[in-house]
Amino acid sequence: MKTTHRIIACLIALICFSAQRAAADSPLTSTDFHQAYADEPIVAQVEKGRTPSDETWAYLAAPDNPVAVKMAIINKIGWAFEGKNSSQLFLSYLKRKGICKTEKDLYKKRPGDLLLCAAYFKALDNYFNVEDAARMARKAKKNHPDSYTVNII
């Protein structure tokens, strides 16, 4: 009789534990690495979850600024479950400033750090479909194969 009770108890436990869904956060959305860059003035002035200012867009577009700080800015801007349009806003800024004409132009002709910014924004904009973002990030990695930041993002 004890054996039967143990088997039933084990079956009930198995059913209970297997019925729970496993869920995992993505490092894209669950790692607030921008906190490590809190002493950078440009990172400190970005409001988490808010649309960036022109000063922030300019920092992201400037080729001489460190890519790690650029990624920290984007990380702080973050994502929203219902989606965002930061990648389109970034592309619009680049177009307005004459840096690129289209996303295709950005992909083919621009430096890897700009492409990585666009890729990270695109991934955060549509967290459930990162195919384009991954393609852009791979291209950025080809342009900067030795960059730790580019490789880790």
Language-model features, listed with the residues they occupy:
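Bacterial N-terminal signal peptides that target proteins for export
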Residues: 1-9
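Bacterial N-terminal signal peptides
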Residues: 9-18
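N-terminal alpha-helical interaction modules that lie
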Residues: 23-110
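Soluble non-cytosolic domains of exported or imported proteins
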Residues: 47, 109-113, 127-131
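Residue-level recognition of tetratricopeptide repeat
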Residues: 66-68, 111-113, 143-151
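Short coil/turn linking the two alpha-helices of tandem helical-hairpin repeats
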Residues: 77-86, 119-129
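Mid-length scaffold segments of soluble, non-membrane domains
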Residues: 107-122
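Conserved binding-pocket/active-site segment within a compact domain
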Residues: 121-153
